[in-house]
């Protein structure tokens, strides 16, 4: 229920401040929403598919600060994440302290970035909430640290402040190596929304297809390397039924096609009306779509696609509000109904892919104050491959 309440409130704020352009209380409401999202994620209890894996790591695989070794500080072990866990563990903290720190860090920077680049902040936050919020705060906590830091590295690259940009990328990589992809951003800074970029997006599908063919044998080789952790993990990605299901046309139509098609059509139609803030972000928007398309054939690319998805959400927020405002000759209710009909497939797709399809991982919501054990959720997550789970010990959490 708490998820629906937040979504409903965000929709009301979208109408009041983005569509009807009220100003009174705008900053205060933005801050209240930020605090609410921090607390919901920070005070959760065993909510999210990977939360119990993080819990296991914290209590059974985290040394005290004085016991950290050189191996703990290697890039592959996400040293800044290890240091954070060790610090909290050393001072006698519980794991939900880590959750609050991560949630505050990630959401504050996301909200700051949205406010910096998007005119319609509540609409963008709504899209963030239904598409990336649960992912960043429960499933990929380590990577989320790196991603939000590297978003600001992209801004420095636009200003040609390379030293600051790559310093932030180094910090991001120390949280999770996957964000190394941001280091290659300068190669794509000349991209613009035009016919060439549309052709590039079409080409990215065939690039993904070629990678899928060439990487298939490599994944089989990794699978045969029984002692190799990376091999085991990649092999499990390939054999996990949910990932196999993602490769089918049915799931691609539900999960991926709407955001790709809506983004291309809406932004291309409104490209001459984009604000200067958005025009600066064109390269990242196109990169995000390209990775999204490549993930249709190479599912592990969804990790990179999620790193750039915030740019797609910023552009979508602008185009949706702009299209609705263009209907002012119509009655307000008629204009809103038209927008609802036009964009409901997109919203439903985002909701289905995050909060509906795997709802057993997140619903019902439980907090550290009640600490309820949801048997259905526990059975589900304990049967997930490639994850070790700790027992549901209320006192330990």
Q: How should each PLM-predicted stretch be described?
A:
Residues 47, 52-56, 64-68, 186, ...:
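Alpha-helical transmembrane segments and terminal signal-anchor/GPI-anchor hydrophobic tails
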Residues 24-25, 111-131:
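Transmembrane-helix signature of polytopic, membrane-embedded enzymes
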Residues 79, 91-108:
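Loop-to-helix entry region of an early transmembrane alpha helix in multi-pass inner-membrane enzymes
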Residues 138-150, 154, 175, 264-324:
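Membrane-water interface signatures at transmembrane helix termini and the short loops
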Residues 284, 337-397:
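Transmembrane helical bundles and short interhelical boundary loops of multi-pass, membrane-embedded
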Residues 133, 164-188, 289-293:
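Membrane-interface alpha helices of multi-pass inner-membrane proteins
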Residues 52-63, 71-93:
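Short hydrophobic/aromatic helix or loop-helix immediately within or flanking a transmembrane segment
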């Amino acid at each position: 229920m708490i998820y629906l309440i937040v979504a409903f409130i965000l929709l009301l704020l979208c109408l009041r401040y983005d569509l009807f352009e009220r100003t009174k209380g705008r900053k205060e409401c933005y801050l209240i929403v930020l605090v609410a999202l921090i607390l919901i994620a920070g005070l959760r209890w065993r909510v999210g598919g990977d939360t119990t894996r993080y819990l296991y790591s914290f209590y059974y695989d985290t040394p005290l600060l004085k016991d950290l070794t050189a191996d703990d500080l290697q890039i592959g072990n996400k040293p800044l994440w290890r240091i954070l866990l060790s610090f909290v563990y050393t001072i006698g903290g519980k794991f939900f302290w880590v959750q609050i720190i991560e949630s505050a860090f990630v959401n504050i920077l996301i909200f700051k970035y949205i406010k910096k680049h998007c005119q319609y902040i509540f609409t963008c936050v709504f899209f963030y909430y239904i598409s990336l919020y649960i992912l960043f705060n429960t499933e990929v906590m380590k990577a989320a640290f790196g991603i939000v830091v590297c978003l600001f590295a992209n801004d420095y690259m636009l200003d040609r402040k390379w030293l600051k940009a790559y310093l932030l990328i180094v910090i991001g990589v120390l949280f999770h190596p996957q964000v190394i992809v941001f280091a290659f951003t300068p190669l794509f800074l000349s991209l613009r929304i035009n016919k060439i970029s549309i052709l590039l997006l079409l080409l990215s599908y065939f690039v993904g297809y070629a990678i899928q063919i060439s990487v298939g044998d490599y994944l089989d080789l990794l699978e045969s390397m029984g002692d190799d952790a990376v091999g085991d993990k990649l092999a499990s990605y390939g054999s996990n039924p949910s990932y196999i299901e993602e490769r089918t046309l049915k799931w691609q139509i539900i999960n991926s096609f709407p955001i790709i098609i809506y983004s291309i059509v809406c932004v291309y139609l409104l490209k001459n009306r984009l604000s200067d803030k958005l025009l600066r972000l064109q390269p990242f928007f196109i990169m995000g779509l390209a990775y999204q398309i490549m993930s249709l054939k190479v599912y592990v690319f969804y990790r990179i696609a999620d790193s750039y998805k915030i740019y797609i959400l910023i552009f979508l927020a602008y185009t949706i509000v702009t299209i609705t405002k263009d209907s002012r000759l119509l009655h307000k209710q008629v204009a809103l109904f038209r927008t609802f009909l036009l964009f409901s497939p997109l919203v439903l797709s985002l909701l289905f892919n995050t909060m509906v399809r795997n709802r057993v991982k997140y619903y019902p919501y439980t907090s550290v104050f009640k600490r309820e054990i949801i048997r259905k959720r526990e059975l589900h997550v304990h049967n997930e491959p490639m994850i070790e789970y700790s027992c549901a010990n209320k006192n330990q959490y």
